[in-house]
């Protein structure tokens, strides 16, 4: 039976957790394994997404049948969508799956605000206007614990100087 | 093996390091058995506009890790010498600021680099997420360099 290594993130987790599961395992097995390691709050409906995919995986499906491959990144979250608001010189809003990365939201926001080239390169997203820049690979689901909405700020990169 | 090396080798097995390796963000050069302590060498992915090969090797000095912050230098793994300054990554944002051979030819100008941290205490506030703490692992340093060389808003020319 072939075993694959995958990385699973969920609410509040700073880094993905590495799990090893058989390809024959189901998405429900994945949830159970992740829970066994303490990543997921017990109780309530939990959805599982592949990174940057909009549709959750059915719990009864086998990993090997739903494109979960070696070294895949997945996300467990209670929200089906997260309503993301980005503030810059105005406000833009869009719903994303919790497994969407900050990098993808940033690219969307740059396009929405008409930024390109150098104007785009020096922009980062933050959860508050003066906070630390978000890591591009972060799943947005890790940034919201209870609600299914997220406010972000598009701000200039702070240069290393002085 | 000293406690610094023991801890470093534990962190090589951490989920955070292996997740970055799985994403193609970085990798250890050669195998763990080839490490000449305290100088492991890592490859870090880069946008080709900043480094035409698509990455850069960094030779670390992790003496007294993690109580003491790391420092690193761009490295030529063929000649096993410091990378020629002409080949250091160059570009906008923080790229040419961090890879600044005119400041110091053997370290990165970074808030998590122990040589650069000297006399830059204001970075502890301005770049608090990156200012080295003994609770960090070397993965934090790799993240800083990777973010610098791969701005999320950057698009490769010609794409």
What residue ranges belong to the model's regions?
Chain A
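Ubiquitin system architectures
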Residues: 1-162
